[in-house]
Structure formats: structure tokens, C-alpha cells
């Protein structure tokens, strides 16, 4: 059913990358100095205040990295989408890499595939510049 195809692909994408994100957040949380939480507790900060003012603030940079990595990984996904749906029923799960593959290998329209690849490279390059700017 084309209504559930993209939701299934999104679920599999999240499920497949969940361990990486979990380990990244775990290592970031373990690197937060315990002195910060102790000092805030001594100053009278509650559990929720410490979580929002200390823990989340310390995880902000890791969260940004994870979001950018996930966007980049999702943008270049081809393999598991092709294996699961080949672009889906009625093109429901067709992403840019699958469209490039269809143009280049199925219809042999190499010019359109090259133009789409150049656009995809430009978009990824801009994301990399934004990511490394910080």
C-alpha cells in the first residue's frame, strides 16, 4: 500500500541508525562533568532545572552533529530503499538517489541523471559547509 510505504522506510531508517545515536548520546552524557550537577544541586536547583539548564545545554553540540549526520545519511540512502521497495508503489518512496539510478540505468537518460547528481552534490556540499562552519 503506497500510504504506508514511506512510513515503513522512515521507520527502518530510524531503526537502523538508532544504535549509533544512542551510543553518541550516552558518551556525551558521560562526558558531562559531575561537578556541574553537584554545584547546581548545592545551589538549590531541582532535578528538572538541572536537566534543562545543564544536561541539555551540554548535549546541544552533539545533537546538532547527530541531526546533520542523519540528514546527510538519509539524503544519500539508496540501498535499503531499493531493496525494500524499488521506489515504492506509485513512486511513493522514490528519493533523489533512486531517481538518479532510474534515469541513468533504467531509461539511460544520462544527462538528466548527471544534472540531478550535480544538484545533489551541491546540496550536500552546502550542508557540509554549514556543518563545518561551527
What is each PLM-predicted segment?
Residues 26-34, 112-134:
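C-terminal transmembrane helix and the adjacent membrane-cytosol boundary/short C-terminal tail
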Residues 1-14, 79-94, 102:
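Membrane-interfacial helix termini and adjacent extracytoplasmic/periplasmic loops
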Residues 11, 56, 64, 68, ...:
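Hydrophobic residues within alpha-helical transmembrane segments
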Residues 23-63:
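Intracellular coupling helices
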Amino acid at each position: 500500500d503506497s500510504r504506508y510505504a514511506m512510513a515503513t522506510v522512515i521507520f527502518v531508517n530510524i531503526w537502523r541508525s538508532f544504535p549509533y545515536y544512542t551510543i553518541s548520546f550516552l558518551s556525551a552524557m558521560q562526558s558531562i562533568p559531575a561537578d556541574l550537577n553537584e554545584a547546581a544541586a548545592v545551589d538549590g536547583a531541582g532535578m528538572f532545572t538541572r536537566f534543562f539548564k545543564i544536561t541539555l545545554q551540554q548535549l546541544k553540540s552533539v545533537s546538532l552533529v547527530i541531526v546533520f549526520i542523519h540528514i546527510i545519511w538519509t539524503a544519500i540512502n539508496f540501498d535499503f530503499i531499493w531493496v525494500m521497495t524499488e521506489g515504492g508503489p506509485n513512486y511513493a518512496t522514490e528519493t533523489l538517489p533512486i531517481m538518479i539510478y532510474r534515469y541513468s540505468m533504467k531509461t539511460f537518460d544520462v544527462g538528466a541523471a548527471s544534472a540531478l547528481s550535480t544538484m545533489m552534490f551541491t546540496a550536500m556540499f552546502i550542508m557540509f559547509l554549514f556543518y563545518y562552519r561551527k
